[in-house]
């Protein structure tokens, strides 16, 4: 894929020229609002709380189906969203942490497929890797032995997704940065020490990240008009 095809500028996407974008994004915004308004305590895991948490991501799956042009890129982005929703549901229950991590790892692989591997830009990979290693070198000090391998494997995949998204550019790059930040806050709050407003920061940046990542699929003239 051509990294220059990063999608239409956001101000264009949300203009009167493309009313279908705003119309099909409304369910996502409402689902996000519902999640933050209900704010179900994390110590009360249930299928209801899992559904409420997953709803915004599932709305984005429908959004892509309704608005984005067809093709492998759109399907890969939808696959990433579905896996993310599975990961969201798993992380409701602490005992399903490994399943959630695996689901998000597959989601990032879908994003990797959507953004491609050309142009390579190894210098950018070096920069993201050095930043990731700095963070994970501190995080490793607080991980139990059984957590080291899965967390590091996930970090490697996340870093790869960040690299390719930055090469792709546009909203995808901002989405990947927010996703990485969200995961960083979540990991620090989970394994190092409790951070104030960690859940609010994590979930708000996470939902924004997913939206920005999938907006990269919207390219003119392929936008659907219904």
Curated annotation (Swiss-Prot):
Provenance organism: Mus musculus
Keyword line: Cytoplasm, Endoplasmic reticulum, Hydrolase, Lipid metabolism, Membrane, Transmembrane, Transmembrane helix
Cellular location(s): Endoplasmic reticulum membrane; Cytoplasm
Recorded topology in the membrane: Multi-pass membrane protein
Known catalytic reactions: a 1-O-(1Z-alkenyl)-sn-glycero-3-phosphocholine + H2O = a 2,3-saturated aldehyde + sn-glycerol 3-phosphocholine; a 1-O-(1Z-alkenyl)-sn-glycero-3-phosphoethanolamine + H2O = a 2,3-saturated aldehyde + sn-glycero-3-phosphoethanolamine
A GO BP annotation: ether lipid metabolic process
Any one Gene Ontology cellular component term annotated for this protein: membrane
Superkingdom of the organism of origin: Eukaryota
Protein name: Lysoplasmalogenase TMEM86B
Family of this protein: Belongs to the TMEM86 family.
Residues in compartment: Extracellular: 41-46, 94-99, 141-146, 189-199
Role of this protein: Catalyzes the hydrolysis of the vinyl ether bond of choline or ethanolamine lysoplasmalogens, forming fatty aldehyde and glycerophosphocholine or glycerophosphoethanolamine, respectively and is specific for the sn-2-deacylated (lyso) form of plasmalogen.
Subunit record text: Homodimer.
TM helices/strands, residue ranges: 24-40, 47-68, 75-93, 100-117, 124-140, 147-163, 172-188, 200-218
InterPro entries: TMEM86B-like
GO terms of molecular function: alkenylglycerophosphocholine hydrolase activity; D-lysine 5,6-aminomutase activity; identical protein binding
Entry comment describing in which tissues the protein is expressed: Enriched in liver. Also detected in brain and testis.
Activation and inhibition: Competitively inhibited by lysophosphatidic acid.
Broad class of enzyme this protein falls into: hydrolase
Enzyme Commission numbers on file: 3.3.2.2
Residue ranges annotated as Cytoplasmic topological domain: 1-23, 69-74, 118-123, 164-171, 219-226
């Amino acid at each position: 894929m051509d990294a220059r095809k990063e999608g239409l500028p956001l101000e264009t996407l949300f203009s009167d020229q493309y009313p279908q974008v705003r119309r099909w994004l409304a369910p996502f915004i409402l689902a996000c609002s519902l999640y933050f308004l209900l704010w179900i305590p994390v110590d009360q895991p249930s299928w209801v709380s899992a559904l409420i948490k997953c709803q915004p991501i599932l709305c984005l799956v429908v959004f892509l189906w309704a608005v984005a042009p067809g093709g492998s890129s759109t399907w890969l982005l939808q696959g990433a969203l579905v896996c993310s929703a599975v990961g969201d549901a798993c992380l409701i229950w602490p005992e399903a942490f490994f399943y959630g991590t695996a689901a998000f790892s597959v989601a990032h692989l879908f994003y990797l497929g959507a953004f491609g591997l050309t142009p390579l830009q190894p210098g950018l990979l070096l920069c993201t890797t050095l930043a990731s290693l700095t963070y994970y070198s501190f995080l490793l000090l607080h991980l139990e032995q059984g957590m080291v391998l899965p967390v590091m494997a996930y970090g490697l995949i996340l870093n790869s997704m960040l690299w390719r998204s930055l090469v792709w550019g546009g909203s995808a790059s901002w989405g990947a940065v927010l996703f990485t930040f969200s995961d960083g806050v979540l990991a620090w709050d989970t394994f190092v020490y409790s951070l104030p407003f960690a859940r609010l920061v994590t979930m708000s940046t996470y939902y924004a990240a997913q939206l920005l990542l999938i907006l990269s699929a919207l390219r003119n003239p392929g936008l659907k008009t219904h």
